[in-house]
Amino acid sequence: MGMPNLGDMMKQIQQAGEKMQDVQKQLEKIVAYGEAGGGMVKVSVNGKQKLLTLQIDPDIMDDAEMVQDLVIAAVNSALDEAAKVAQEELVKVTGGMMNPADILKNLNLGK
């Protein structure tokens, strides 16, 4: 076996970089939702695990501790859903050639 062609290796590196840019764009497009307290708190996050929206039922605003607990539960629910959808999308983008969990970890989005 001969040495790998340097030109081919550089092309593969460039293609991997382009795939990562595609992954970043796809993650921004993913929107996941979470709610808690029977819908009293609703949130949405994107695939890059950024909070997009937060809705709190005004009727519960006088109970700060409950609101805090519900916000945390809703955000965590949405983040879990976003991570699941992100992994599914990454499998599509990479054609199964790369481990989605490793990609998310490299993007500082994995656990």
UniProtKB/Swiss-Prot annotation:
Q: Which Pfam families match?
A: YbaB_DNA_bd
InterPro entries referenced in this protein's UniProt entry, alphabetically: YbaB-like_sf, YbaB/EbfC
Cellular component, GO annotation: bacterial nucleoid; cytosol
Protein origin, superkingdom: Bacteria
Name the Gene3D superfamilies on file.
Nucleoid-associated protein YbaB-like domain (3.30.1310.10)
Any one Gene Ontology molecular-function term assigned to this protein's record: DNA binding
Which cell locations does it reside in? Cytoplasm, Nucleoid
**What keywords are assigned to this protein?**
Cytoplasm, DNA-binding
Give the main localization category: cytoplasm
* Task of the protein: Binds to DNA and alters its conformation. May be involved in regulation of gene expression, nucleoid organization and DNA protection.
Q: What HAMAP family has UniProt attached to this entry?
A: DNA_YbaB_EbfC
Listed under subunit, the entry gives: Homodimer.
**Similarity section:** Belongs to the YbaB/EbfC family.
The protein depicted here goes by the name Nucleoid-associated protein Cpha266_1171
Protein species of origin: Chlorobium phaeobacteroides (strain DSM 266 / SMG 266 / 2430)
